[in-house]
UniProtKB/Swiss-Prot annotation:
It catalyses: GTP + H2O = GDP + phosphate + H(+). GO terms for molecular function: GTP binding; GTPase activity; guanosine tetraphosphate binding; translation elongation factor activity. NCBIfam families: EF-Tu, PRK00049.1, PRK12735.1, PRK12736.1, small_GTP. This is Elongation factor Tu. Keywords: Cytoplasm, Elongation factor, GTP-binding, Hydrolase, Magnesium, Metal-binding, Nucleotide-binding, Protein biosynthesis. Monomer. Mg(2+) binds at residue 26. Pfam families: GTP_EFTU, GTP_EFTU_D2, GTP_EFTU_D3. Belongs to the TRAFAC class translation factor GTPase superfamily. Classic translation factor GTPase family. EF-Tu/EF-1A subfamily. It comes from Francisella tularensis subsp. holarctica (strain LVS). CDD domains: EF_Tu, EFTU_II, EFTU_III.
Amino acid sequence: MAKEKFERSKPHVNVGTIGHVDHGKTTLTAAITKVMAEKNGGMARKFDEIDSAPEEKARGITINTSHVEYESPNRHYAHVDCPGHADYVKNMITGAAQMDGAILVCSAADGPMPQTREHILLSRQVGVPKIVVFLNKCDMVDDEELLELVEMEVRELLDQYEFPGDDTPVIMGSALRAIEGDEAYVEKIVELVQAMDDYIPAPERDTEKPFILPIEDVFSISGRGTVVTGRIERGVVNVGDEVEVVGIRPTQKTTVTGVEMFRKLLDRGEAGDNVGILVRGLKRDDVERGQVLCKPGSIKPHTKFEAEVYVLSKEEGGRHTPFFKGYRPQFYFRTTDITGAVELPEGVEMVMPGDNVKMTITLINPIAMDEGLRFAIREGGRTVGAGVVAKIIE
């Protein structure tokens, strides 16, 4: 049979399984692919295929991640599953696998465990918009009241981290029994995917978001003016648009007088395009790498923020020794390094290679930033950590 062609007609949504080790994340992933393949076409994937996750590199960090895909009646899902807890931490902090929503897997037999909490916290810190819950291994619990108790605990945990516990869909089932073909449990997988369809919002397309282009280079072309180059991160820019240059120095306004790509003049550029943009009235020295060109008022420069950070282990090429408060590395945002000072949370004296930690960072120059922006931590050009802006302070 010929390969089915990739259907572009359905909206594409990125999800992932999160939760404590051995609560059944990978088994659930296998169950969803099997049930959806039977109902809507596509490939069923076995536990072993998913579990032997290939290594990937994201921002110089090695992460083991498995990618599967499946179709619901309304959507095409790309789904990530990680074998180890450390892989989740790295994956979520680096944004290697962007998640529009997460499926929290919690064993009904064990209830919430430390990593259940930690993955919910990470989801909050890195800006995962919605979580749906699958209470797994319900076939091992005879007591209705016990199931209700675990459900209540999970909802309370979600509330603690500012997810709407009461409104979150909670599906009770057994991934293993669904794989074995037990009809009652297959139905629960269908219910779960239906809950994802209903509860996880389809992501806004990159082209619909406000325009932003991280500036990589600046040239001056005699007789034409100043050109900034870079890859449009999101949004669309048209010739004639007013834009701002934000970051490092005071914000400046200008107008786009030309957009070129591969030496051809265009009327517009959009997310993903590598372009040169001609800007009116700015000199070559007014603009520098590390600033962004953006829709006026859409993004502000900031210097102080709270971040969730993963520190590379020695084996990953990171530091060999811990760092302490007052640590001053470079923070690499988009296209440039900015020096900053680190404050650690109360009671944390030092951070070891391989740890993840919440910290407050103060940069010496402002950078255009939103919550959710990813960055690398570097020492002399070598990556020693990865982070994400969790909360802007000033």
